[in-house]
Amino acid sequence: MARASTTPTTRTDPAALPSRIGRLLGEVRWFLLLAVTIAFLTILLSYNKADPGWSHASQVDDVRNLGGRVGAWFADVLLFVFGASAYWWALLLLRRVWRGWRELMSDERVPRAATPRVDAGVTWFGFALILSASMGLEAIRMHTLHMKLPRAPGGVLGDLIGGSLQHALGFTGGTLLLLLMFTVGLSLFFHFSWLNLAEQIGAGVETLFVGFKTRRENKQDRAIGEAAKVEREEVVETRRVRIEEAPPVQIVRPAAVVKSERVEREKQQPLFVDIQDSDLPALALLDAVPPAQETVSAETLEFTSRLIEKKLKDFGVEVTVVAAYPGPVITRYEIEPATGVKGSQIVNLAKDLARSLSLVSVRVVETIPGKNCMGLELPNPKRQAVRLAEILGSQVYNESASQLTMALGKDIAGKPVVADLAKMPHCMVAGTTGSGKSVGINAMILSLLYKARADAVRLILIDPKMLELSIYEGIPHLLCPVVTDMRQAGHALNWAVGEMERRYKLMSKMGVRNLAGFNKKIEEAAAREEKIHNPFSLTPDAPEPLDKLPMIVIVIDELADLMMVVGKKVEELIARIAQKARAAGIHLVLATQRPSVDVITGLIKANVPTRIAFQVSSKIDSRTILDQQGAEALLGMGDMLYLAPGTGLPVRVHGAFVSDDEVHRVVENLKSQGEPNYIEGLLEGGTADGEGGGDGFGGGAGLAGGGAGEADPLYDQAVDVVLKNRRASISLVQRHLRIGYNRAARLLEDMEKAGLVSAMSGNGNREILAPNRNGNVVEEE
């Protein structure tokens, strides 16, 4: 009895073990399960088809599987039977590891189901559905896995399941059934409801949407509040500005023009009126300068300054007017843009600002040299006249040492503006009809006539209109009559090119660099009572002496008409003169009322650096003449932009006005001083009188070859003079035909080639070989 009673107490029941030992055994089981799971995943992930396995034989010594040969063999079996779906076994192990971890970490055991057998059966059934559906889908759909598995995708079982379903239900039907099995298997294996999952996802999406909507509404509310706050601040700031007093605008009045001593000297009555110490015309020939009048009052300047600030502020541009410079025609307001305001904004508002200020135009000056502000040029209500007499009587004009000083007018501050044509050295003038271009050219010509005598400056005037420059006909400064025929204009330019080449040859021979150096050598020789002979004389035995050479100014009133009639040849001649003629003392003044690219070509623009733009019709014309806009905003009636050479900023100048009566009085005064000394043949093309010869100059081209002298229209008259007087003398032909020395010498040389006269003897005389009226040959000296 005693032995029977003690037997049950000696058995080892796990449930009766202490809790610590039970927990220790549970941890050992969990670690073993974790190790098995890791080893399982390792041999599957490191599977290599080349390793030896159950499904194939291999003699490879180096096994790449991390589980060695056993692991390679076991992985080959799993993948051969299940395919890639063998990884679902790893999921099963991981689920058990996760459940064991929960049991270890909890103080109490995880509650089990009331019917553990039913729960385990449902789990295994769900796993079987997942595994079967996965193998079937793999066999039907995932054909690309064939290269990585020992057999076909899905393994042996997948091939059986997928092939049977595809044969029975077709490709699509089998796929749908397998997807249904996979979905049900997931629900049974993980013990979750798809409906609950859908509800949770929907609740999460709804929460995100409501949160986003709430944040957007809050952001809109904050933006509305900020806008209301800014609006309140702007209203307060606007009311504060209205009561602020703006600083007064600095008004700079134009300085008085300083008159030269010449004006005061001419006002004095000379003791002997018949004695003249100068051939220059008197300033009294011009109209008197009217008294200066105030164009804009200080109150108007202050009011306009505030109006400019207000109008620009209406357009969203904050500026401050810091200074005003009233002039004879326009007033420049210097404005300082606020921080962040671009200059292009103000430039684009020029037309709108002019309309709001009820003005014809407003010119915006983006850059003022030496200042950090911009300029607005507004026309004055009352325009003050700028007379040429005021500019010619100024100290600036009379103190200029250059004999090619031209009076342009006054700048915006009322100061006289003069320019030296010798430094330009050529000038391009453009402007529409009525812009004051012709008056400006007359002012330039009169400036030259008031500065230099006829022996220092000579003119060639080309006037296609036959109205503008014909008034100067007969003055001593002209080299030829005023040219009105455009073909003769081409001959005149051709002569100028030949004269330029001749002067360069002379300067090169004498070792000087420009015309001033040449004339200085002539003066020094004259002071020593010596003469410098022409090194290129046609009579080398008796060369003629050289004289001082005058500067030549060629004025073309309408370049467009000249280009249209004569064509491309004129462009080449103008380009040659513009490129080389500066040192030779030849200068161009080109004017046109059509500043288009076919008139002012790139070749001409490249060699004429000085530009004067009167009012033009468009921005394109302004860019053509100035390479920038601005001339389209001028006021006309002599308002111009003067672009000096070497600068990119044009200066606004109000041109000096000179009437036709003033021009007539000056011209009559000059005519009374002497007859013009025209150069014969200058307009005849190829027969112009000169030295050195050349193509189209001095008849060099027409006289090349024996007997070619008959091309000279005076050749027959020269032969008659020689035969009639029975004497072959250069001075005789020169005196009777009133031509130059060189031309007469060439005519005698042509007679020598034709056999009319003999060659020059040792004493410089020629014999006449032509028969007399009786038919006998007479030889006379």
Curated annotation (Swiss-Prot):
Subcellular localization: Cell inner membrane
Pfam families reported in the protein's UniProt record: FtsK_4TM, FtsK_alpha, FtsK_gamma, FtsK_SpoIIIE
Swiss-Prot/TrEMBL keywords: ATP-binding, Cell cycle, Cell division, Cell inner membrane, Cell membrane, Chromosome partition, DNA-binding, Membrane, Nucleotide-binding, Transmembrane, Transmembrane helix
Biological processes per GO annotation: cell division; chromosome segregation
Record: residues binding ATP: G434, S435, G436, K437, S438, V439
InterPro entries xrefs: FtsK/SpoIIIE/SftA, FtsK_4TM, FtsK_alpha, FtsK_dom, Ftsk_gamma, P-loop_NTPase, WH-like_DNA-bd_sf, WH_DNA-bd_sf
Main location: membrane
MF-aspect GO terms: ATP binding; DNA binding
The keyword Acetylation is annotated on this UniProt entry: no
Entry annotated with the keyword DNA-binding: yes
Any one Gene Ontology cellular component term annotated for this protein: plasma membrane
Segments forming domain FtsK: 414-623
Membrane-crossing residue ranges in chain numbering: 24-44, 74-94, 120-140, 170-190
Cytoplasmic side: 191-781
Membrane topology: Multi-pass membrane protein
PANTHER family: DNA TRANSLOCASE FTSK, SPORULATION PROTEIN RELATED
Domain comment quoted from the record: Consists of an N-terminal domain, which is sufficient for the localization to the septal ring and is required for cell division, followed by a linker domain, and a C-terminal domain, which forms the translocation motor involved in chromosome segregation. The C-terminal domain can be further subdivided into alpha, beta and gamma subdomains. The alpha and beta subdomains multimerise to produce a hexameric ring, contain the nucleotide binding motif and form the DNA pump.
Quaternary structure (record): Homohexamer. Forms a ring that surrounds DNA.
Family that this chain belongs to: Belongs to the FtsK/SpoIIIE/SftA family.
Function: Essential cell division protein that coordinates cell division and chromosome segregation. The N-terminus is involved in assembly of the cell-division machinery. The C-terminus functions as a DNA motor that moves dsDNA in an ATP-dependent manner towards the dif recombination site, which is located within the replication terminus region. Translocation stops specifically at Xer-dif sites, where FtsK interacts with the Xer recombinase, allowing activation of chromosome unlinking by recombination. FtsK orienting polar sequences (KOPS) guide the direction of DNA translocation.
Protein name (Swiss-Prot/TrEMBL): DNA translocase FtsK 2
Species name: Ralstonia nicotianae (strain ATCC BAA-1114 / GMI1000) (Ralstonia solanacearum)
Classification lineage: Bacteria, Pseudomonadati, Pseudomonadota, Betaproteobacteria, Burkholderiales
